[in-house]
Each structure stands twice: as C-alpha cells, then as structure tokens.
Design a protein with these regions (language model features):
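Bacterial N-terminal signal peptides that target proteins for export
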Residues: 1-11
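Bacterial N-terminal signal peptides
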Residues: 9-19
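Eukaryotic scaffold repeat domains enriched in small/polar residues
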Residues: 24-258
Length: 258
C-alpha cells in the first residue's frame, strides 16, 4: 500500500508509523498529544516485520488489527504470502502483543482490511493476475472472518479476475457501513476495473460506480476506501493523487487534491 493518499483514521496512521519509522516525538496543538513508540508491535517466534498493508482499530477502541504481509524480503513484493505458512491478519493488544492471528494460506498479496461493528474482519487480496500461479484459487477476492478467524463469507471468485458482479480485479480495500453494506475498492491496477462495488450485509450485489479516467467519479488505481461517521465514502485515487468523496449511492460530492 502506498502512503500518498492515506484514507485512514488517525489511530491507524499512528500504527503504520510506529511499525515502520524510528522513534521521534511530535508536538500537537490539541490535547491528544502523542509520541511514536518504536518497536511497539512485537511479532512472535522471531518473525520479521513484512510490509503493512493497512491497520484498523477494533470496535473495543483498544486493540489494533493489521494486515502484515508474510515475507519481509523486497524481492517478493506482490506475492509475499504465496507459499508462506505465516498468518497475515494479526490483532495486537494495547502493549503491541499479538493476541490473535489467522489467514495462513488464504491470500497471495493481502492488502486492505476493515473491522465491522460486530468485530468481524474483512481482508482483500490485491494480487495481480501475473502473480497467481496456474491453478491457484487465491486472489481477486475479499474474505470476511469472525474475530477468531472463521471464514464467514467470500466475495468475488478466488483466483479469477473479472468485472462482473461476482468478480474483482485486484481489490485494494474494503469498508463496511454502519448498516452492514460492503464497499469494495476494485482495484489496485491503473488499467483495471477502477470502480467501487457495493453489496449488502448478506453479500448480495447492489451496485457499482466508477470507470477508468480522470473526471469526477472516475478512477485510476483505487487504493483505499473509508466511510466517515456521516456515511460519506472516501476513495483514494492513487494515479491522480486525489481523494474523491461520494454518498453511498455513488453520487460524487467533492474531490480533495494535493
């Protein structure tokens, strides 16, 4: 995941920083002053920290969920979990200890994550088609897990890219609305589907919007998606270096640029 268009809560951004950069302090103008805690995340059994796809705060407000790619080697970029037995979905307590992990063998390139109000964890696999071995039924899908790792739902057709209602092409991210509706950023590649796909809480297709381009409502590489407390849908449009804002029916309301 690129950090050029972060559509994340402040807490999740702080987790990224604490995992990836040296210790330093930052003065704040608000009462919520904070300091970076170097080495906060403690991976078990000597595991090396791979790339962090995304992090989210648990509904309890204390724990942090993160997608951490399995292999820390730079030469594996794009397929870090292809042949790994490591879990890419990890839950950390406030002290940075892993208290839950799962997802081994289910992803090739886990990318986005969200946690719904019931504590279920949603994870996307944004692997590109040329990184999926022949016959492998992973990639181009989104998995809903219980908080203990039980697979509850799969959206998309694993291992098969496409642009229909039951297919994605390298879905980058997922966001769950307060009513349970599911919004998928589809997807990671600039020349891919470039759309937002919406499902209800049962996984039934409702609608999609977008298309490849630079006009309002069009995208070039959707890289992140989030929903604010007012229900607005924020989409990180990476190749255009902008954030587009929509209502939940796909109506464009604003664009933020760098």
């Amino acid at each position: 995941m690129s950090f050029r268009n972060p559509i994340l809560s402040l807490a999740a951004v702080l987790v990224f920083v604490s995992l990836l950069v040296p210790q330093q302090s930052a003065a704040q103008n608000s009462t919520n002053a904070y300091m970076i805690d170097e080495g906060w995340a403690k991976l078990p059994n000597g595991r090396m920290m791979g790339a962090v796809g995304k992090a989210k705060v648990d509904p309890d407000g204390r724990h942090i969920w993160a997608v951490i790619r399995c292999d820390a080697g730079q030469d594996r970029f794009g397929s870090e979990c292809l042949d790994s037995d490591l879990d890419p979905v990890l839950k950390f307590d406030p002290d940075g200890n892993v208290v839950e992990s799962f997802g081994s063998g289910l992803f090739i390139w886990p990318h986005g994550i969200d946690v719904d109000s019931d504590g279920n964890v949603w994870v996307t696999d944004a692997v590109s088609d040329n990184n999926i071995p022949a016959g492998d039924d992973r990639g181009h899908h989104v998995i809903k897990f219980s908080s203990t790792g039980e697979v509850l739902m799969i959206l998309g057709t694993p291992g098969e890219q496409g642009d229909g209602p039951n297919n994605f092409t390298s879905p980058s991210d997922v966001a769950i609305a307060s009513n349970g509706d599911v919004f998928i950023a589809d997807g990671h590649n600039a020349n891919g589907n470039n759309r937002v796909v919406k499902y209800n809480s049962r996984g039934e297709y409702l609608m999609s919007w977008g298309g490849t381009g630079y006009a309002p409502g069009e995208f070039r590489a959707l890289h992140a998606i989030a929903i604010d407390p007012d229900g607005r849908v924020f989409v990180g449009d990476r190749s255009k270096s902008r954030i587009q804002i929509f209502d939940q029916e796909g109506n464009h309301s604003a664009t933020w640029t760098q």
